[in-house]
């Protein structure tokens, strides 16, 4: 107690350790907010430097999130994944971290790791439709069509208007030649968005498989009119012409696309 009063009345300065902590915190905040400003100004390289300097002082979860998103935008998925794995260890109860990690693993085509991340998200939040969708994508990447459909069906049950899940399920059903079930998904998607290009292309593939070449051609052409840069539409249409022995039309189409 006497030591306390002595230091209080004598006006002694803070200990070197306490002063260092204050300086470190100040420098951390400067680097962090400089990084955010750089990000807003469209200078990702400088933002990365600032966030990296900030994290060298303090491994703060929020700043790690900012940096991981930057790495994803810049295509540096290995660095993003390393950060996200650290974040998942720091805050293992956050679904969003595992969802982002699953998406990064998908970009890297590491489907087993993607499946693990999606399963961890589901363990935290069973009713998360996106997590079940990502699990379906992971099984699709491992060529497991039946489990892909099962997980996508769960996602759609949780979120009936989940366009991406319906499109992926339709694509998988096409592989299995289950056209009736596939068209239920296509019709549901087109009811929400009549100009959904992937849905129209898949509908064209069903018509083509059923021997309705002219109707398939209409769908493929419609997509090229909506979006002249949709390469898949030109490929499907060109392949249809080749199958119909319309080689002149196919060559002309591919020349136009190029």
Each PLM stretch: what is its role?
Residues 8-30, 53-56:
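TPR-adjacent "capping" and linker segments in tetratricopeptide-repeat scaffold/adaptor proteins
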Residues 25, 58-59, 92, 126, ...:
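Short coil turns that delineate tetratricopeptide repeat
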Residues 28, 61-63, 95-96, 129-130, ...:
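Helix-start (N-cap) detector for alpha-helical repeat units in TPR-like alpha-solenoids
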Residues 40-41, 73-74, 107, 141-142, ...:
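Register position in tetratricopeptide repeats
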């Amino acid at each position: 107690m006497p030591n306390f009063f002595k230091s209080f009345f004598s006006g002694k300065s803070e200990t070197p350790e306490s002063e260092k902590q204050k300086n470190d915190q100040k420098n951390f905040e400067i680097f962090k907010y400089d990084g955010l400003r750089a990000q807003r100004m469209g200078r990702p390289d400088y933002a990365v430097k600032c966030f990296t300097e900030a994290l060298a002082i303090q491994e703060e979860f929020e700043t790690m999130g900012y940096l991981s998103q930057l790495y994803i935008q810049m295509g540096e998925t290995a660095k993003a994944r390393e950060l996200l794995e650290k974040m998942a260890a720091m805050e293992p109860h956050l679904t969003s971290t595992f969802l982002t990690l699953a998406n990064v693993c998908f970009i890297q085509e590491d489907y087993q790791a993607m499946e693990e991340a999606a399963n961890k998200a589901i363990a935290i939040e069973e009713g998360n439709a996106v997590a079940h969708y990502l699990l379906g994508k992971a099984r699709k990447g491992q060529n497991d069509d039946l489990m892909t459909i099962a997980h996508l069906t769960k996602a759609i049950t949780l979120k009936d208007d989940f366009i991406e899940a319906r499109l992926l399920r339709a694509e998988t059903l096409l592989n299995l030649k289950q056209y009736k079930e596939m068209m239920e998904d296509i019709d549901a998607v087109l009811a929400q968005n009549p100009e959904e290009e992937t849905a129209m292309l898949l509908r064209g593939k069903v018509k083509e498989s059923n021997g309705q070449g002219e109707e398939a051609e209409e769908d493929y052409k419609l997509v090229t009119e909506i979006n002249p840069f949709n390469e898949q539409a030109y490929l499907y249409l060109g392949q249809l012409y080749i199958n119909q022995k319309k080689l002149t039309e196919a060559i002309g189409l591919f020349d136009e696309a190029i």
